[in-house]
Structures are given as C-alpha cells and as structure tokens.
C-alpha cells in the first residue's frame, strides 16, 4: 500500500514538472508540494564547458530518474548518466533548462532541482560588460570605505592565471586577465616583450578593461606572438604576471574530421537520434549529410558504386555549427543503415561514416521494486543485452565497410556516387585517409590513349578521368576557334558548342574552352581539374562565369565555360573613357559608348551580387580585381577565376604579371602580411575594384613603390576619392578598407546599399568633364621609357606600347601619390 502511495506521489510530481514553462526555468508555485519551499540550485556554464550535476541521495534510495524541463533525460554521445550524476560534454545553449533529479525510497521520494543557463557569450571574445559594471561598483565601494588600511597589490584569482602559454589560431580574439586588488586601488599597465605596449603598435589596436583587469586583442596575427606582462602597482608595492602568446598560422588543407565522429548509434524504435560531425577547415567548408539507400532492391549500382540520398546540405543562412549535427526524429526501422558526413572546400573532400541500428522498443511496465536483488538482476540483464547489440553492430559495420568505395559525388537528391577527384594530387591515394575511407583504386587512372592522336603533354602522363554524364560533351560537338588568351594553367580559345541545351540539340552556342598548354605539368592538370570540380560544386549564378560542360574522354581535358565577348571589366572601362581627357593615352580616340554614373554603380552592384553568392557557397576568391571580372555582350558582369587553387604568396612581388599589375595592390593587410584569407579580405579587394570602376580602369596606388606601399598601408593611408565618385560611394570604399576585418561590411550589406544607390541614380548623370583630373590614376603611368619613367613604380605599370605617347606626370600625383591617411 505504501508503494502505491509513493508511485502516485511521483506521478503527480512529474505531471507538475511537465507544466513548467520553458522560457523561465523556475519551478511554478503549484509544483511545490504541500507549500514546502523548493530549493533550486542555479548554474551558469559557458558553451563548450563540461556541465556536471550531482543529486543528493538518501541511504535507502531504490531508483533515480533525471528530467529536463519535465521530459525524461536520455543518454547521447554528449550526455552521460551514471546514477546520481549527469555529465554533458561540450555544452551548448540548447542544454539550458530546469533539471530535476527524482529519487524514490521506502521512506518517500525526493526531488532536487538545478536551473542551468548555458550562456551564449564566449569568454574569449565578449567584453564581459556585466563583470565590468559589477567590478566598477566594487571599486567605487572600496574607494569610499573610510579608514581602510593600506594594502600592497595582490592577485584576487590566481587560479585563473595558471595557464601561461596560450596557442591560438590566427584571426581569433585573445583576452588576458590579471584580476587583482589593493588599497589604494592599484593601476594597471601592459608590456609586450618587456617594452611598453601601445595600441598603435598593432593593426587594429587593442582594448583594456580596467574594471576586469584585462586586455583584449581582436583578430590576432602571427606578428602578435610574444610575452605580455601585466604590471599592477600602487604606492605600497608592485606585482606582475607574464602570459606567452603563440599565434598558429593557418595553412590550406582539405577538411579534417574529428576521429570517431559520427559515432555508431543503437536506439529503440521511435527514439530521437543525433549524429555529430566535427569539421576543421581553414577555407570555409561545405558540409552535407548523406544516407546510403537501396534502388530497385540494390545498394550497389552496376558499376559497383553505392547509391546515396542527400539528407541535409548547407544553405545561404545555415551555419557550420548547424551543419555539423544531423537530427533524426522518431526513427523507424527504415531509418537504420549507414550515414555519411561529407565535407569539402577549395582544397579537397573528406568524409566519415557511421551506422544506425534500430531495435524493437521494450514495453515499460510499472513495477514496484521489492528488493535490491531484483534491481541488480535487471541492470545486469540490460547491460548484457546492450553489449551484445553493440558487438553485433560493430561486426555488421566491419563487414559492410569492407566493400564500400570511398569516392563521393553529392550534387543530386538521389543519385549514384561518382568518383570524386582530389583537388591536389590525383595519381596517388591519400595516406591520411580516415578508417572509413577505404579507397582501393586510383581516382585518376594512368592509361594510354593512343587512339586519340593527341600529343602527350610534357611532364604529364595521360590519365583516364571518370566520366560525369551531367557535364560530358562529345568532342565531335565542339568546334575550336581562335585563341582568346593564356590563363594560369594553359590557354583559352573561342569555340562553338552544339547541343549544350538538351532540349535544343542543334543549337550552336559560343563558348570559351580552357585547356592545358603543351608544356603543362601534372600540377597544371591537377589545378585545372580542381577548378572544374569547384565550379561544379558552387553551381550557377548570373554574375559568375558558369561551367557549361567538359570533354574528359578520349583526348585532352577541355573545360567549357561561358564566353564574355567584351573582355574583362578593366579593358571595358578604359575603352569607354570620355574623349579629350589628359589621362587618355589616345586623345583622338572616340569611345564606343559613354557611360553614365548609373552604369558604373550597376557594374559594382552586379559584382557584389556575384561575390555575395560565392560567399554563400563558402568560396573565398583571393584575387578579386577588375581584370578578373568579364563582361558579356549584354553588359552583364561575371566574376571569373573563383575556382582557382591559387597560392598568391608564391608570386614574386617584384615581378610584373602579364598585364603589368601585381596582386599585392588588391590584397588586404592581413592577407598581405599574415596570409589570412577570408570573406573580409575579399571585401577589401572589392573596395579596390570600386576604385578601379570609378576611375574607369585606373591603376591603384599610382606611383607608389612596393616597399612604400607596405609601409603606407601599415600606417593607415588609403587612396583618394576619384573625381566622379560620390561621397557615399567613397565612404563605402573606405568601409571596405577598414583595418579590422570584422568591421568591414559583408557582401550582403554591400548588395543592399548598391541596390538602393542604383535606384536613386539618374540615367542622365554622365561623367563631368569639367572636374580637374589630377585625382585620376592614369591607366598607363609615365613609365614607358628611360626619359619619363620612375624606377620606383615601374613594377606597377604596363610594358611600353609603340603607339602610346609618353604622358606628362601631374605635380599633384608626385606630391601625394593619390593617398590619404585613414
């Protein structure tokens, strides 16, 4: 009889707990039995920390039950329940709530409550405003207390200062604390490597929070390495403490997946399942979740490749944290099987797989524990059953994984996995592949294609590439024409493609074809394949050069892309400069058409739209400039070369490129000095591209030698406003050139601002020819011969052209070189 009363009491208590409101993790008054005050222990946990809860137990406890917000708490890969204790690893804000530990015993039941708040604030990047306020109040209180005895400075929280060596990746925020006290209140100052540390000693400066005795440095770079010493002193003494900072420089690599994740799962029918996949990547990764499925009763196709279904893929508004977790609700027997986490970036692809086993749900029968022996029997039987299931799952997984191929292709909702080509070295299987990547075949197989009649490229053996039916175009439907130029890996020729549109098989389309040069190497082949695979992954957009097809079989590799008839944006702008201007190298030249202000803003708007799309696909361009934007017959701007696997820092800064311009003039300071490439560094380059547009193809930083440019950028100098540029657009350029990357606008914000400016700009606002021209940067600076060249800036100019006269240099250009101090 007493047992039934206990059970009834427990049911009433659980029902009351279920009524608890989620937004406020507090216990309602009606949940407090018989008016007895209920104690709730409050816990504040930072994201990523270990959450530990321990229940108070009586000696005669027979059962323990854990609830969160009135719902039964179950174990997962992060949550471990061991009787009276609960541990949650890598806590996240979703773990916040009201936890309850309900214990039953012959003498009654007891409940312990924990109110858990997992703060969204990261301790390394936030300003701890609450701490500042409270500390300030304490300081004021300390100062106002009368008759306080003098005390030399001392540490108030020495346990928080035990970690002296801090190794962090570049671009992270670093915060050092020296919490201390004394009477009178001591002062705080910071040294770097034993010398006084001032904000202007680093790009972006730093913040000192005197209320919390801390220093904060945003977006750290390798030059921030060193020893940082805090000195706390008053008239009665001085103490100091030194932290060592090591900034780890990021290097490009394909995504790295944490070993053991995702982990195999064995759950009951109707349960919820969570797969976790930790991805580490410097170039931002594109993550997908796949499930291996059966098609017509078979998991393997005729070509011995498995079928998969895409369950989750990254969108414009999804974050990497959201993509790292796959949730399955109310699982059924059909959900059992193999699941794969696939991550890719501009360097390559990686994947891990795990198995889900679904078991028949066990009926829950209410029973009263009559003896501890009965409870032990249930525990032993349950443990033996679970161990057997786990062993069975491991055996099945080993048998299945031995027959799987590791080549993945994931662009259709349900499709066969095509052979994925690594984006660096194709001819060997990577030795660092994970255990779940049992690749046993060469992804690019050596073969002799003697039937093709094509001469073998120097330094490159011939290879058989896997055919992709969605992109493959027969060679007899491609007619090659005149050369258009030379690219990074080879040459580009004009061609006519027949039947690119499957619905119109006889339509002829003008296209551009990228191919290798005769002296190409294996690395050139690797890079061209890398660019093709990246274009497939990124997809299509109006303002980027889109992939149309490829010829990979029975001959050399041809990559077919859209053709832009009006050349690159820089040449397009120069050809449309108003006649009679001093900086025009041919004053008698009549432009093809005159551009209005609205036309120029439209150019910028279209490029921003293309970059916004690339950013949404986690693609970092690294070399955005007017020369890499192409113009179609309909004046549509298309961003090119976004799929190149380039390493800009292998370029000699003192060597001219083919068009006489160096990438350094478009590179952000963090990319130039510390090799950190992000979407924010692309925004800096976009600001330089804006300057090119409104100078009608001018050369950035005219007359400035490389060594001087480095110095001026570090000192905060920026280029002047072009004459035909509004103040609003110039401020947009300056925002793009902010020294702190996080303070620059995003491409989404730039698109919104330029869209508004386009709508407000009149079609009749042509360039004002009466404005003085000394602020324009000449397209061809005066470096054409020994009689009018400057040795300092010859690295920034064009090679001499026979029909171009030597232009006089403007005095104002020599005076300030078109630069302002920010």
Curated annotation (Swiss-Prot):
CDD domains: IgI_1_FGFR (cd04973), IgI_2_FGFR (cd05857), PTKc_FGFR1 (cd05098). This is Fibroblast growth factor receptor 1. Its main location: membrane. Residues 136-145 have a biased composition (Basic and acidic residues). Autophosphorylated. Binding of FGF family members together with heparan sulfate proteoglycan or heparin promotes receptor dimerization and autophosphorylation on tyrosine residues. Autophosphorylation occurs in trans between the two FGFR molecules present in the dimer and proceeds in a highly ordered manner. Initial autophosphorylation at Tyr-653 increases the kinase activity by a factor of 50 to 100. After this, Tyr-583 becomes phosphorylated, followed by phosphorylation of Tyr-463, Tyr-766, Tyr-583 and Tyr-585. Ubiquitinated. FGFR1 is rapidly ubiquitinated by NEDD4 after autophosphorylation, leading to internalization and lysosomal degradation. CBL is recruited to activated FGFR1 via FRS2 and GRB2, and mediates ubiquitination and subsequent degradation of FGFR1. The active site is at 623 (proton acceptor). Residues 782-792 have a biased composition (Polar residues). The modification Phosphotyrosine is found at residues 463, 583, 585, 653-654, 730, 766. Belongs to the protein kinase superfamily. Tyr protein kinase family. Fibroblast growth factor receptor subfamily. It comes from Mus musculus. It is found in: Cell membrane; Nucleus; Cytoplasm, Cytosol; Cytoplasmic vesicle. The record marks 766 as: Mediates interaction with PLCG1 and SHB. Disulfide bonds join 55-101, 178-230, 277-341. Glycans are attached at residues 77, 117, 227, 240, 264, 296, 317, 330. Residues 398-822 are cytoplasmic. Residues 160-177 are annotated as: Heparin-binding. Monomer. Homodimer after ligand binding. Interacts predominantly with FGF1 and FGF2, but can also interact with FGF3, FGF4, FGF5, FGF6, FGF8, FGF10, FGF19, FGF21, FGF22 and FGF23 (in vitro). Ligand specificity is determined by tissue-specific expression of isoforms, and differences in the third Ig-like domain are crucial for ligand specificity. Affinity for fibroblast growth factors (FGFs) is increased by heparan sulfate glycosaminoglycans that function as coreceptors. Likewise, KLB increases the affinity for FGF19, FGF21 and FGF23.
